[in-house]
Amino acid sequence: MLLLLTLVSILVSPFLANAGTPTAPVGGALEREATEAFNHAEYDQVLKLWYSLPSEATASKPLIRLAFQSTLRLGRPEEALTLYQRLIPTDQPDDPALLRPLALSFLTSHVSDREEYVRITAYTILAELGLPETQAVLEDGLLDTSVLVRTRAADAIGKAGLAGKSGPLRRALNDAMPAVRIAAMKALSEAKVIDIMPYLIEVGRTDDGPESVFAYAALYRLGKQDMLTDITGAATLPDPDVRMAALGVLGQLKRPSSLSVLSQGIYDPEPSVRAFAAGALGDYGQASGVGPLTHALGDDSARVRAVAATSLGRLGIHDNHPLLRALTRDADMQVRASAVEGLLRLGDTSAIVLAAELAKHPNPSIRAAAAHALAATSDKHAVEILQTLLQDQQPQPRLFAVKALGKSGAPVTPLLKKILQDTDVAIRLAAAGSLLQQLRHPTTAPKAR
């Protein structure tokens, strides 16, 4: 009997000992199999191996990394985010080499989404970023059924510096919709693609709408300086759409001779044209625009007053401070938000208090306007307000808060990573875009005051 008990003790003790020790990391066999599958581009097989792991198993970092890379290749960024969190715990510094492709995957995986608004959002953000490595995705966008997607794709190709070598962008000059053709003209002319000049001359000769103005502008960029006369003349034509196009172009070209025409636009009978003129004076960027913008602050149209306030802030002239401070008491809340933005652009962080009040307004569009205004500063109190708006019940304030954080010089990456899990897909895409903005200049962003 004693001998039997001794034998049982010897046999059982190893199992008892093993039960008390942590589960060992998964052995090399599974890792080698996953590596081989990955090297053969069998990404589904890699994930099949990954998900076959028992829940109690401790996976090795190389295996997690293989699964992470496979989810990116398959366009499944939500799964990749979970794996990233396993690779880089929240108490460790982020790895840009992993976080950047993860953020980009959120955008590229939605460019073919069934919902048009999602595709528009993805391409709009890609246009803001201008990433050369997305050329294939951007050129695919030129074939989308949505006019806005095609337009944003053309813009993005130009911003990415790809216009000069993009055959699909040249073909977009023949698109059925003017907005796409205009975007293609702008991108190609900025890339100094000279051989489109005959096309541009023909458009300028035959079109009597806004498209002709953009053709003139493209010709001007390509060296035909006399086109400035045609653009200036278009700013006084009967069609308000043509006048707006001309004023917008003149503001961007920033020619000293254009000031009188831009100033005259502030007195246009159409409020939409006056607003365009106010915005163009902000683009023009010269102190000589203060006079007409000051007049615009008294306009009957709240939209005109709001754009004028933003433009005054963009000029960066501190003498405009009293004008903007007075506008924070405007009857229209959107105008107040624009005045706050203008003050913040002038470095007046006391305006953050006013932004905080607007961020509590019952109208979600006003809360969104407050978030937009706060993009003009990296002050820590501004970040706190934006962080609160990230919890808003309505998507619009959350969306603008996420975009504002992308422009912040404060350390906001942890906040943006959290928003990658938002319930609204458009906000997740905006968070990805803001993360890419943050990763672009991690060391040169201004410090929070």
What are these regions (language model features)?
Residues 2-14:
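Bacterial N-terminal signal peptides
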Residues 70, 94-98, 125-128, 156, ...:
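Core register positions within helices of long alpha-helical scaffolds
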Residues 114-115, 145-146, 176-177, 207-208, ...:
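Short inter-helical turns and helix N-cap capping residues of alpha-solenoid HEAT/ARM repeat scaffolds
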Residues 12-102, 446-449:
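N-terminal leader/linker segments that initiate helical-solenoid repeat arrays
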